[in-house]
Amino acid sequence: MAPALLFTFYRNAHTCEQRLLCLRQLNPGLPIHGLYSGEPTQLGDFSGVRDLLDSCYQHPPQTPEWLWSNYDLVISRWFGEAGQHHPFTYLWVHSWDLLLLDPLAHFVPGLDSDQVLLPGLRPLAAMDERVLNPLESSGESRWSWLQEPEFQAFSDYWKEHYGSPLWCEVSPFGVLGREVCRRYAEACWSVPGHNEYRFPSLAAALGARLLQGGFSPQFWQLYEPDRKPWTLDEVLQLARQPAGQRLCHPFYYPVSPAQLGC
């Protein structure tokens, strides 16, 4: 089972360079591919980032709002136009504003080609946005996205074309089997909606095995998507704690492997 990592980025070049240096230090030999979705005219500012990547793909220009809500389509375009030519069994999807302080294998030891692991995965009917750990969810549906017009469009489309159970997720990263990437990239383009429910629902409908669990209490204490950005002092304090499943998100500032003790 050979992993690769897709590093998605669009701003803060120096921070991106330091993230990649940390990833390289913690995961020697790991292929790391880049997906740039920023302004085309600013790609030249990221020459140092590109030097640290095994490959770099530039996504066609889109608004920040579109890119955020269609992250699954962004990744699928990368796979169709570039990723399918790279060898890997499963793919880590890692955004530039995430900092992992432990090797990837501490979080996910391995994955089969037809599997998906999303830490926040749960049935849509049980999505309580107040509870991050899906295994501790109240089972009561409370999610603001369900009130958006685009969800109604998705729901209508889903009933007509699939009708299978709906899933959703809010996660700091995703780990996707290669076969999942291939099937999804062929089928996703006509499906309306938002990536946080479209991706897991469609992946499952296409035969992916969805995985849950495997994350420590420390992981869920550290991951708070709505928190204020981590400060450098907070990150350095966490870096001095014992290894485990340590992560910081969002964290926007550069910090070197030497500072972190990697």
Where are each of the predicted segments found?
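Short loop->beta transition adjacent to catalytic acidic/histidine clusters or analogous donor-positioning motifs
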Residues: 2-3, 25-34
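Short, well-formed alpha-helical segments that are part of the catalytic scaffolds
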Residues: 12-26
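Conserved catalytic core of nucleotide-sugar-dependent glycosyltransferases
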Residues: 99-192, 196, 200
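C-terminal catalytic/acceptor-binding lobe
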Residues: 180-262
